[in-house]
C-alpha cells in the first residue's frame, strides 16, 4: 500500500510539472479479461499521463453444487431419521408437527446454486515514465461487497428441515415431556444442516420462506496497482492496451447462517482445525487480491 501511495504522489507531481505541456485527447474503448467486459472513456493529459473511467460487466455465472444434509454431531443422514417422524409428532401439537410426506421426500443432499456478482466501476491513471507505450497504472475499482452468493436451488426446500429442527428445539425446552426429551436424546437426534469447518450451517428455523443463503464478502472499494502497454488514447485512430495488475479487496469473509450452542445467528466463518470444508475456508481467507488481466481496444475521438 505504501508503494501505491508513492505512485499516487508521483502522479500529482507529474501533473504539476507538466501543466505547461497540457495537450488533451479523448477516446473510448472496449476490452475483455478477468474483470469481465470493460467499457470506458479515456483522456490523455499529455504524453506522460492518461486517465480512464468506466464499467466492467461481469457475467452472472451460476454454479450448481450438492451438499450432504445431516445432523450436527452424530452425522445422521436424512434416511436414518425418517423412522422417528411419527414418534416425534406424537409429542407435538398440530401446528408444530413435521409433515411426514414432505420429510419422506427430502433428499440426502441439498442442491445449492452459487452466483457470481462482481460487476465493477473503475477510475485508473496511466503513467508513462519513458514517454513510450509502457506504463504503470494506479487507481481503484468500485463494486459490490457480496461477490458470491449461494442459495438453495428449490424455493422452500428447507420447510421439512425447519419443521424437524423446530421439533428438536422443542424437545430441549424446559417443561418438555420427559418421554419426548428421552426419545430425542437416547437416539442422538439432532438438528439437520450442513457442516462447514467447525460450523453447523442451517436456515433460521423461524424463517417463513424456508430458505437459506450464504455469501462471500470483500471490500467494495479496491485500490489497484498494475503495469501494461498502450495509451489511454492512441496517437493513431485505433490502438490497444494490455493490463496486468491486482485489485486489493481485503480479506474475504464467508457469511452464513449457523446454529451453534443453541443459538441461531448469521456470522463470519473462520477457518478452524477440522471439519468438512475447512480447507476451503482457509483458502478463501488468504485470497486478499484479485488478479487483473485485460486486453482493450481503444479509438481516438480527437
Predicted region positions:
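Bacterial Sec-dependent N-terminal signal peptides
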Residues: 1-23, 297
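Extracellular/periplasm-exposed beta-strand and loop segments of Gram-negative cell-envelope proteins
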Residues: 25-30, 60-118, 145-220, 250-288, ...
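Hydrophobic, lipid-facing positions within transmembrane beta-strands of outer-membrane proteins
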Residues: 26, 35-39, 49, 119-123, ...
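Membrane-embedded beta-strand positions of outer-membrane beta-barrel proteins
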Residues: 28-30, 41, 53, 125, ...
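Transmembrane beta-strands of outer-membrane beta-barrel pores
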Residues: 32-36, 55-61, 140-146, 231, ...
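Feature captures outer-membrane beta-barrel proteins of Gram-negative bacteria and organelles
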Residues: 39-52, 56
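Structural signature of outer-membrane beta-barrel channels/translocons
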Residues: 42-44, 126-130, 228-234, 298-302
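Repeated loop/turn-to-beta-strand initiation elements of outer-membrane beta-barrel proteins
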Residues: 49-51, 132-136, 235-238
Amino acid at each position: 500500500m505504501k508503494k501505491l501511495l508513492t505512485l499516487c504522489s508521483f502522479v500529482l507531481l507529474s501533473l504539476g510539472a507538466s501543466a505547461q505541456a497540457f495537450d488533451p485527447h479523448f477516446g473510448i474503448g472496449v476490452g475483455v479479461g478477468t474483470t469481465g467486459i470493460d467499457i470506458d472513456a479515456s483522456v490523455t493529459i499529455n504524453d506522460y499521463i492518461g486517465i480512464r473511467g468506466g464499467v466492467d460487466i461481469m457475467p452472472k455465472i451460476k454454479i450448481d453444487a450438492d451438499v450432504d444434509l445431516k445432523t450436527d454431531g452424530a452425522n445422521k443422514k436424512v434416511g436414518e431419521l425418517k423412522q422417528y417422524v411419527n414418534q416425534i409428532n406424537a409429542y407435538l401439537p398440530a401446528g408444530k408437527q413435521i409433515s411426514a410426506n414432505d420429510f419422506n421426500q427430502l433428499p440426502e443432499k441439498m442442491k445449492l446454486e452459487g452466483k457470481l456478482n462482481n460487476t465493477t466501476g473503475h477510475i485508473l491513471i496511466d503513467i508513462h515514465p519513458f514517454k513510450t507505450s509502457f506504463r504503470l497504472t494506479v487507481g481503484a475499482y468500485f463494486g459490490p461487497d457480496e461477490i458470491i452468493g449461494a442459495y438453495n436451488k428449490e424455493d422452500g426446500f428447507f420447510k421439512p428441515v425447519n419443521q424437524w429442527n423446530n421439533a428438536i428445539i422443542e424437545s430441549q425446552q424446559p417443561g418438555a415431556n420427559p418421554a419426548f426429551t428421552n426419545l430425542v436424546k437416547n437416539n442422538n437426534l439432532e438438528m439437520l444442516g450442513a457442516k462447514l469447518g467447525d460450523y453447523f450451517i442451517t436456515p433460521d428455523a423461524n424463517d417463513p420462506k424456508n430458505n437459506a443463503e450464504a455469501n462471500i464478502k470483500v471490500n467494495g472499494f479496491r485500490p489497484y496497482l498494475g503495469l501494461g502497454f498502450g495509451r489511454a488514447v492512441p496517437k493513431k485512430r485505433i490502438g490497444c492496451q494490455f493490463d496486468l495488475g491486482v485489485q486489493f479487496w481485503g480479506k474475504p469473509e464467508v457469511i452464513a447462517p449457523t446454529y451453534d450452542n443453541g443459538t441461531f445467528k448469521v456470522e463470519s466463518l473462520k477457518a478452524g482445525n477440522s471439519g468438512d470444508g475447512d480447507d476451503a475456508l482457509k483458502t478463501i481467507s488468504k485470497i486478499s487480491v484479485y488478479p487483473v488481466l485485460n486486453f482493450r481496444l481503444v479509438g481516438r475521438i480527437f
